[in-house]
């Protein structure tokens, strides 16, 4: 585990973004942990989050020239990544996002921000559950003449999707592009084991993974 990944887990815990307990997910599964990037809700938090996304993309050697944020949650995430690229890598990368509702006046259309045509986009989101929002974003990008270079997420839960493979793997197969997480469930387990995490919490996560983890 890299230092930035350990820092990210610690920061997520401090902010209450990552919590342990009993949580019912949209899938109906009862999870021993919950991850809510909506609590990265200040300038300092978004700045740190953006830098972590950038670090993961750089280490994965992703070649891209546009950052795309699916509405609504992905919009501040994409903005944070674009700013972090400028601040830490001296790269002035344009960004764009979509509207949930088509605008029929002014500039109109579904997309806001930089032109997508001819660009290699990184789609930025928090996690991948069903993958629907990611696939919709990819369709918008390709319809506008762009391509998807990668998908950047904060956490890969490494859970099964519709089949035995993970929802992340399903997205990779569908888009033909890699999914790059800041951390995975592997990193979280390692962090808890190395930092004296409560034994019952770590056991609960391992039991959950044994039941719902991807093959």
UniProtKB/Swiss-Prot annotation:
E.C. designation(s): 2.4.2.10
Residues engaged in binding 5-phospho-alpha-D-ribose 1-diphosphate: 26, 72-73, 99-100, 103, 105, 125-133
Record InterPro entries: OPRT (IPR023031), Or_phspho_trans_dom (IPR004467), PRibTrfase_dom (IPR000836), PRTase-like (IPR029057)
A GO BP entry: pyrimidine ribonucleoside biosynthetic process
Residue sites binding orotate per the record: 34-35, 129, 157
Family, as annotated: Belongs to the purine/pyrimidine phosphoribosyltransferase family. PyrE subfamily.
Protein purpose: Catalyzes the transfer of a ribosyl phosphate group from 5-phosphoribose 1-diphosphate to orotate, leading to the formation of orotidine monophosphate (OMP).
HAMAP family, A to Z: PyrE (MF_01208)
NCBIfam families the UniProt entry points to: pyrE
Protein name, as recorded: Orotate phosphoribosyltransferase
Species for this entry: Halorhodospira halophila (strain DSM 244 / SL1) (Ectothiorhodospira halophila (strain DSM 244 / SL1))
Phylogenetic classification of the source organism: Bacteria, Pseudomonadati, Pseudomonadota, Gammaproteobacteria, Chromatiales
């Amino acid at each position: 585990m890299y230092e930035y990944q350990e820092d990210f887990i610690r920061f997520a815990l401090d902010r209450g973004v990552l919590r342990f307990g009993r949580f019912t997910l949209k899938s109906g599964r009862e999870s021993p942990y919950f991850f809510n990037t909506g609590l990265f809700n200040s300038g300092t938090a978004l700045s740190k989050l953006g830098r972590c996304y950038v670090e993961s993309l750089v280490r994965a050697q992703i070649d891209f020239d546009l950052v795309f944020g699916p509405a609504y949650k992905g919009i501040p995430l994409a903005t944070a990544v674009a700013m972090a690229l400028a601040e830490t890598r001296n790269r002035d990368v344009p960004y764009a996002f979509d509207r949930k509702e088509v605008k029929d006046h002014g500039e109109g259309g579904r997309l806001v921000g930089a032109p997508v045509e001819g660009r290699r986009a990184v789609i930025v989101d928090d996690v991948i559950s069903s993958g629907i929002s990611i696939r919709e974003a990819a369709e918008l990008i390709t319809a506008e003449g762009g391509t998807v270079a990668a998908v950047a997420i904060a956490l890969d839960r490494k859970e099964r999707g519709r089949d035995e493979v993970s929802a992340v793997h399903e997205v990779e197969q569908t888009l033909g592009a890699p999914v790059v997480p800041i951390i995975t469930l592997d990193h979280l387990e390692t962090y808890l084991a190395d930092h004296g995490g409560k034994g019952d919490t770590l056991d609960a996560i391992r039991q959950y993974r044994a039941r719902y983890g991807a093959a």
